[in-house]
């Protein structure tokens, strides 16, 4: 130990001495970033239009879990049934598969010659990425444009090496990034991509999150941690109930959400349609407990406050919040307290719309943040705040006009905040606003 102290006290000796230090690096202006393309695969359907329509129509993507859903190919039937019987949670939010409209085509994305070895969560990412790129009308072929296009797509549980499949679809030499921050992965991926554009690393970024963790091992692990809903195994569609007094855990889900982010002038010059502007990105850490947030929501408060400060907007200018609320007893209450702390009188005025869309989609883990960011962008575009399903008996933390939406609400939404808070205390808030004029 004493030897280590002696080493650390030694002065740094440089081989080459300079009489003059370098000038500071050039100060690059922070560029504005907008959303120009959207793509989704969710338990509500495949595609942005189908998912959004079912969400605002108050439909639910949760269903009963079956032994076949455990994906235990190669095991005998007795082992599969024994495993299924041991699970305390028997509901899940599963992507609908098939050939029809709004269905995920497994033959195209998992069984075709090009995708036969593709992991399911990567197939979801590729499907939503293709939709987002076509929506943005950004399919570059020139080397210069491809070099200025990057990818930032993360997964919560899947193999991160497979993210390269999405990168190869999009770019040759642009930034290539994959965040892995539990349930905040999708939000961090979008926020990090925004900063890459702001600092000039790219002009276009394809960003989001993806997840496919409905399998025996993942579900068993969450069951052991007592994180999943177990009271409503016989009533799957009411099992995910954010902010409700009778909530008892989250419903595991799967899917992907991807958006195309673009530097504002770049988007304008090519005549791209602009959904919204990314105004703020706030991050924080709880450092409190591996699965439990601080009851006062200190980490959430910091993330939301930092997003607001970066945006230049006043809390009263935010019209909608898509809450992280997963339907867990502690997490939902902590976030509700945090929102009330940050938005104060605005939260109790009735002017601030608040909902958790996980009542409809379940918890998509690594994809939750990106899917809910897209919901926030669509809320701005369509002037509709989506509902919180199964909110029959609101938690006592809500009072004095402070109450989540239980039905869809048509309203002007100038700015929307999307929260994502992951296990381990990793938090992210994204703030979107109406497109610049």
Which residues fall in each region the model found?
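Conserved beta-ketoacyl condensing-enzyme motif
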Residues: 35, 56-180, 196, 210-221, ...
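Active-site nucleophile and cofactor-binding loops and adjacent substrate-binding regions
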Residues: 55, 117-122, 144-146, 177-185, ...
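Glycine-/small-residue-rich "gating" segment that lines the acyl/pantetheine channel
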Residues: 64, 173-177, 191, 195, ...
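ACP-dependent fatty acid/polyketide chain-elongation machinery
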Residues: 2-114, 265-277, 374-389, 428-437
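Active-site-proximal alpha-helical scaffold in enzymes
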Residues: 125-138, 179-211, 251-272, 364-385, ...
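Condensing-enzyme catalytic core mediating Claisen C-C bond formation in acyl metabolism
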Residues: 32-36, 63, 233-311, 320, ...
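Flexible, low-complexity linker/loop segments at domain and module junctions
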Residues: 7, 12-35, 141-146, 311-317, ...
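Acyl-CoA/ACP chain-elongation machinery
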Residues: 201-248, 282-295, 325-333, 349-401
């Amino acid at each position: 130990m004493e030897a280590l102290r002696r080493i650390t006290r030694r002065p740094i000796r440089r081989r080459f001495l300079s009489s003059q230090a370098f000038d500071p690096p050039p100060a690059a202006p922070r560029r504005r970033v907008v959303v120009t393309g959207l793509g989704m695969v969710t338990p509500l359907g495949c595609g942005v239009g189908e998912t959004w329509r079912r969400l605002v129509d108050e439909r639910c993507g949760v269903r009963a879990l079956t032994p076949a859903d455990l994906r235990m190919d190669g095991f005998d039937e007795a082992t599969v049934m024994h495993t299924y019987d041991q699970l305390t949670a028997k509901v899940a939010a599963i992507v609908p598969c098939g050939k029809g409209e709004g269905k995920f085509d497994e033959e195209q994305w998992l069984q075709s010659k090009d995708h036969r070895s593709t992991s399911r969560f990567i197939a979801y990412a590729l499907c939503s990425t293709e939709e987002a790129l076509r929506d943005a009308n950004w399919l570059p072929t020139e080397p210069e444009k491809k070099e200025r296009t990057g990818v930032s797509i993360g997964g919560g549980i899947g193999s991160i090496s497979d993210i390269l499949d999405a990168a190869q679809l999009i770019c040759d030499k642009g930034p290539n990034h994959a965040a892995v921050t539990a349930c905040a992965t999708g939000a961090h991926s979008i926020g990090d991509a925004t900063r890459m554009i702001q600092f000039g690393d790219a002009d276009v970024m394809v960003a989001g999150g993806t997840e496919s963790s409905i399998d025996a091992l993942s579900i068993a692990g969450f069951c052991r941690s007592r994180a999943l809903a177990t009271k409503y195994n016989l009533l799957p569609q009411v099992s995910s109930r954010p902010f409700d007094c009778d909530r008892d855990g989250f419903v595991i889900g799967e899917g992907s959400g991807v958006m195309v982010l673009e530097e504002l002038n770049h988007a304008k010059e090519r005549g791209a349609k602009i959904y919204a502007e990314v105004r703020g990105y706030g991050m924080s850490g709880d450092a409190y407990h591996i699965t439990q947030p601080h009851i006062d929501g200190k980490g959430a408060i910091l993330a939301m406050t930092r997003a607001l400060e970066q945006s230049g907007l006043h809390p009263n200018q935010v019209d909608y919040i898509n809450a992280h609320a997963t339907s867990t007893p502690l997490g939902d209450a902590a976030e509700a307290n945090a929102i009330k702390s940050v938005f104060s009188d605005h939260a109790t005025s009735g002017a601030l719309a608040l909902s958790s869309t996980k009542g409809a989609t379940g918890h998509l883990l690594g994809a939750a943040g990106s899917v809910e960011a897209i919901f926030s962008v669509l809320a701005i575009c369509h002037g509709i705040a989506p509902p919180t399903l199964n909110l029959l008996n609101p938690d006592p933390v809500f009072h004095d006009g402070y109450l989540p939406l239980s039905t869809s609400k048509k309203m002007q939404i100038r700015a929307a905040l999307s929260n994502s808070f992951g296990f381990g205390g990793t938090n992210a808030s994204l703030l979107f606003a109406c497109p610049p004029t």
